[in-house]
Amino acid sequence: MPRLLDRQTPVHFIGVGGIGMSALARILVDRGHSVSGSDPRDNATTQQLKTLGVKVFRQQDATCIDAVTGRTAADSPVVVISTAIPESNPELQRARQQGLEIWHRSDLLAALIEQQPSIAVAGSHGKTTTSTLITTLLLEADQDPTAVIGGIVPSLGSNGHSGQGKLLVAEADESDGSLVKFSPSLGVITNLELDHTDHYSCLDDLISTLQRFAGGCDRVLANHDCPILQEHFQPTAWWSNQSDESVDFAALPLSLDGDRCVARFYEAGQPVGDFTLPMAGLHNLSNATGALAACRMEGLPFNQLVEGLAGLKAPGRRFDLRGTWKGRHIVDDYAHHPSEVQATLEMARLMVRSGRSPLPSAPQRLLAVFQPHRYSRTRQFLDGFAKALQNCDLLLLAPVYPAGEQPLQGISSNALADRVRKLKPDLEIAVAENLDQLTELVIQHSLENDLVLAMGAGDVNGLWSRLTS
């Protein structure tokens, strides 16, 4: 690993447009590396990378490697891949033929983490939001951290930033188990729940992986409100939103509205002060409490952190108001697990019920648009999705986003609709055959002042652009 970090080695990313890969590419550019990459997608991310001087190839084949390989080993790039790149990828095969040094994305992130004091955020849900909030609080406190985040940090306008401060903040993705390579100064674990069943055969496998991650951290901060963490982990410090007893940090809600949370912060059972979080939902209060606790463990004064809370915003695709179309409020959210869908719908329902929201006007109805992600995942969580999706006034379902998987017999959005109907027969549900039809269904069924909430990790986030075009 030292060759990449100690010398100005060129670096080539296969799949540079991915949210995790592009963050690392940005940081290496900031640090003076010559960076190139390939990605068949031409999107805002690849366009931004080009403006930074990154050479981006639209194809993924041997010619990309030939174009960036130097005459000597010192002139040749380190090639970075992610778990999404298969061994059959022709670009990767060419790199191996050329004898180039190949790193997994997690190896590069591990090397960056080892370089400086770092905070790595892990867990099944809330990683991106919590790491974004930590980054934002540090920025507001003039700490200027380096950040490697799985979403766009609003205060940075980017997912990657090479700061001048001493700290690095990273999102530690558990989906492929590679987070066990990380050795941060402080590990933050938001919660644990079975997910990524393509990698983990059971919950015990996931617990074991996170225990290995925790073992590599100098200190660990964990969410006491998660029963699985309570049972299987012994962190340095706990946080809670349920009680200030037997925990190191707590934020107990004083009021919850559709546009904010007001809470009292405790340390070691003693009240420290009240704060207002300009975000709705108990899950966001939990994320913010973890972020505050992490910053307190790094020695930042509470009063300074509270000042930074005023301008907090969630990362991109986390209840992201895209705009208002013909009086309909179009919101995009990355929720693609039953617990995430439930929390997001509860937050949206609170906005409708309370009449208070960050939207331009108070929404009258909640129209949920959901795109299941992967056939295997839909099969695993079919009942959980059905239960979560009841909490809306109208439900529109997009086809399953395959993410490279082949269809499974009996697993479809129609099957999900049938499960929801059994639980809530009077709920109006429509299933689209494609995204064009989904857009037409939104146009036909939505009314002025509806909150149209599009959820999923696939391409359902294109709903806004389809409506406005």
Curated annotation (Swiss-Prot):
GO terms for cellular component: cytoplasm. It comes from the Bacteria. Keywords: ATP-binding, Cell cycle, Cell division, Cell shape, Cell wall biogenesis/degradation, Cytoplasm, Ligase, Nucleotide-binding, Peptidoglycan synthesis. It is an enzyme of class 6 (ligase). Pathway: Cell wall biogenesis; peptidoglycan biosynthesis. One of its GO terms (molecular function) is UDP-N-acetylmuramate-L-alanine ligase activity. GO terms for biological process: cell division; cell wall organization; peptidoglycan biosynthetic process; regulation of cell shape. It catalyses: UDP-N-acetyl-alpha-D-muramate + L-alanine + ATP = UDP-N-acetyl-alpha-D-muramoyl-L-alanine + ADP + phosphate + H(+). SUPFAM superfamilies: MurCD N-terminal domain, MurD-like peptide ligases, catalytic domain, MurD-like peptide ligases, peptide-binding domain. ATP binds at G123, S124, H125, G126, K127, T128, T129. Its EC number is 6.3.2.8. It is found in: Cytoplasm. HAMAP family: MurC. Cell wall formation. Belongs to the MurCDEF family. This is UDP-N-acetylmuramate--L-alanine ligase.
